[in-house]
């Protein structure tokens, strides 16, 4: 979560206080994670609109490369703390710029990544793969972003409920 990233990078900054370059890097990551946390808080405040079906997506031009880079920045503290390997790659991507709601995309991907990190044992791997497919119409592509880990996984019973609101495997 962004709060874990903020705490992790703050701890790293304090332990490297004499290394100005590292501290500056950690502060940039803290700022990025703080902005994401603010975005999540705003999303929580919008929950009543989501439940009533009145939420509006804010589609803007977004660089998928930037999205993946930002995610890597946010999650890298947790990856390092658990001694995990993080792999990110793109396959067959010829157009990185898409129109989407960047906040919602980041929210979904960060939740998936945070869960992957949380449930992957030390020394494990987490990967993110972006793949582009041809769309039905010319100039319209389809994208798949897959988050994969070698963590504990989900029980078959829980998989049937993953899209129910506020569900969590016990």
Region locations from a protein language model:
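Short alpha-helical segment within the cytosolic histidine kinase core of two-component systems
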Residues: 69-81
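Short helix N-cap motif at coil->helix boundaries in the Bergerat
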Residues: 64, 153-161
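Helix-loop junction within the histidine kinase core
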Residues: 48-59
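Glycine-rich G1-box
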Residues: 77, 152-153
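Conserved catalytic submotifs in the C-terminal HATPase_c
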Residues: 58-63, 80, 85-96, 133
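Short helix-loop "hinge" at the ATP-lid/N-box region of the Bergerat-fold HATPase_c
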Residues: 116-117
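Short alpha-helical segment of the dimerization/phosphotransfer core of two-component systems
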Residues: 32-37
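Short acidic helix/loop segment immediately C-terminal to the autophosphorylated histidine
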Residues: 14-21
């Amino acid at each position: 979560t962004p709060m874990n990233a903020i705490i992790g990078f703050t701890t790293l900054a304090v332990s490297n206080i004499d290394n100005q370059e590292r501290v500056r890097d950690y502060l940039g990551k803290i700022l990025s994670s703080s902005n994401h946390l603010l975005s999540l808080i705003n999303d929580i405040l919008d929950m009543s609109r989501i439940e009533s079906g009145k939420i509006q997506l804010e589609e803007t031009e977004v660089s998928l490369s930037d999205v993946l880079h930002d995610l890597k920045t946010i999650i890298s503290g947790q990856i390092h703390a658990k001694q995990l390997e993080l792999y990110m790659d793109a396959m067959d991507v010829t157009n990185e710029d898409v129109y989407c709601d960047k906040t919602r995309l980041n929210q979904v991907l960060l939740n998936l990544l945070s869960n992957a990190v949380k449930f992957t044992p030390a020394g494990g791997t987490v990967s993110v793969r972006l793949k582009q497919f041809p769309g039905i119409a010319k100039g319209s592509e389809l994208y798949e972003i897959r988050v994969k880990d070698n963590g504990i996984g989900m029980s078959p019973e829980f998989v049937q409920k993953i899209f129910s609101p506020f569900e969590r495997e016990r």
